[in-house]
Every structure is written in structure tokens, then in C-alpha cells.
Amino acid sequence: MPKLIGAAAVILDSEGSVLLVKHSYGKNNWDLPGGKAEENESAEETAKREVLEEVGLEVGVEQLTGIYYDPNYDMHHFVFIANNDNNRVPRPSSPEILECRFCSRDELPKPISDFPVRGMDG
């Protein structure tokens, strides 16, 4: 059983574009907002907290779209569809986030991790 749990959120705007964040660490990949669960935190709670920490949005989690295993970290990643209830504009709100923006499937930036593409397919 994997020791770590992670969660991410697929947040779409009114045109169906997905919110992506660019991290300041690692390979500077574009990714879905999300991260590692804290002790005794559910995957859904993790997704909500990480979105708030990374881009300043309070979101509602609607449904689980997929669970993906990352053997490099022995971690399960839970990916949820979430909504931006207040229609607020996302802004980087953590030093670990360089940039955030909504991107259509046809305009996904590079380099990009696997999770945004998988999440959009969910």
C-alpha cells in the first residue's frame, strides 16, 4: 500500500479551459493545482487546501475523475473535478507557484506533467 496520498483539482472556466500552475521547483512543469496530503487529511480536503494555498481559490469538489499511481514516490494521486464557486480570478499565492492560467486543450503549455492531460480525459 502506498505511503503517500496526493490530490489535484481540475478547475474549468466558462469556456472549458483548465487551470494550470507552473511550479518554481523541479522541472518547472505545468500541472494541476494540488499536492501531498497532510496527516489525517482526506484526498478531497487535500485538493481544496492545495488550490487555496497555490492560487487563492476556495473550490467545491464535485467528483473524483481518476486515481493515478506514481511509482517514483510510491504515491496515489486523486484527481477531482472542482468548481470555482465565486468565479474569482486565480493568482499565484505561494512562493512555489510562478504562474497560473487557464489553458484550452489545444493550447496546453510545455513542459507539462501527465496529470492535466489525464484529468481532462477523466
Regions from the language model: what does each represent?
Residues A37, L108-P109:
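A generic structural signal for short hydrophobic patches within well-formed alpha-helices
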Residues M1-V18:
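Conserved N-terminal beta-strand and adjoining loop/helix that marks the start
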Residues D13-E53:
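Conserved Nudix-box catalytic region and its N-terminal flanking loop in Nudix hydrolases
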Residues L57-G66:
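A short coil-to-beta-strand element that immediately follows conserved catalytic motifs
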Residues D31, E58, F102:
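Short aromatic/basic micro-patch
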Residues I11-L12, L20, A82, F102:
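Conserved hydrophobic "DFG−1" position in protein kinase catalytic cores
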Residues Y69-R91, R101-L108, P116-G122:
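Active-site-adjacent beta-strand/loop module that shapes the phosphate/pyrophosphate-binding cleft
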Residues K3, N28, G60, D74-H76:
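Residue-level preference for beta-strand/loop junctions
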